[in-house]
């Protein structure tokens, strides 16, 4: 069987999304580990897990596992179901071979320019997680807080003046490049308390690589066509 090494999903896609696993083909020898818990996801069940925690898969069987996975942000109805899951009875849903005609998929997954409020939320969550780690250097922690809040403030200034205007993209790039140049060489100069991930890779994936997506501009015009 194949193994999935321990890792954390920390790129931008996972800031607001979770993944539902529906095992189609599996074996009792397949175990999924998340944090300090482990479980066998049986065929036909539906599972949700916290991808911010360290997780891995161990397949000691000769069976290749096949899962249907669905990534979504989720409506209030979805999250209400998640909250109440332990109190609800399991429902067996019979297979229906009829074509699905009303399957809804995301059409606007990423904005051309990250909204300042979203950037601030990501920054504050990451800083709080690192500040909760007593092993981090307080002076470096202070420097990173100033660096990331400077990024947010300058980003908000350009956003307030120009929004999605392509004429402002050079200014946005300059802000991102300046921030990237001031990151410490050590990717683990600060480490999160919750899952022991270095701060730099998270900054790179959740902010610097995600904050400016010029090719998405057309999608936000009245005649826009979503990109693949």
What function would you assign to each model-found segment?
Residues 156-228:
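C-terminal non-catalytic accessory extensions
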Residues 1-24:
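Conserved double-stranded beta-helix
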Residues 121-170, 174-177:
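Extended amphipathic alpha-helical scaffold segments
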Residues 5, 23-43:
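A short beta-strand-loop-beta hairpin characteristic of the jelly-roll/cupin
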Residues 17-23, 46-48, 62-80:
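A short hydrophobic beta-strand segment most commonly corresponding to one strand
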Residues 4-7, 30-32, 49-50, 54-61:
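Short beta-strand His + acidic residue motifs that chelate non-heme Fe in jelly-roll/DSBH
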Residues 24-26, 34-36, 51, 59, ...:
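Short, structured patches in soluble enzyme cores that scaffold and shape functional sites
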Residues 69-138:
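Charged, amphipathic alpha-helical linkers/stalks
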């Amino acid at each position: 069987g194949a193994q999935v090494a321990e890792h954390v999903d920390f790129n931008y896609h996972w800031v607001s999304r979770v993944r539902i696993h529906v095992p189609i083909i599996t074996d009792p020898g397949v175990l999924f580990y998340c944090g300090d818990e482990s479980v066998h996801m049986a065929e036909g069940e539906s599972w949700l897990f916290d991808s911010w925690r360290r997780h891995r898969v161990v397949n000691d069987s000769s069976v290749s596992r096949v899962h249907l996975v669905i990534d979504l942000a989720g409506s209030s109805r979805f999250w209400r179901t998640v909250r109440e899951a332990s109190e609800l009875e399991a429902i067996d849903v019979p297979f229906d071979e009829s074509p699905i005609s009303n399957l809804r998929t995301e059409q606007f997954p990423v904005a051309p320019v990250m909204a300042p409020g979203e950037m601030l939320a990501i920054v504050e969550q990451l800083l709080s997680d690192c500040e909760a780690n007593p092993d981090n250097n307080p002076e470096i922690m202070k420097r990173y807080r100033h660096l990331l809040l400077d990024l947010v403030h300058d980003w908000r200034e350009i956003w307030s003046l120009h929004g999605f205007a392509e004429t402002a993209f050079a200014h946005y790039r300059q802000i991102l490049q300046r921030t990237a140049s001031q990151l410490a060489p050590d990717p683990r100069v600060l480490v999160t308390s919750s899952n022991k991930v270095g701060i730099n890779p998270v900054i790179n994936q959740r902010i610097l690589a995600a904050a400016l997506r010029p090719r998405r501009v057309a999608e936000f015009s009245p005649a826009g066509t979503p990109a693949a």
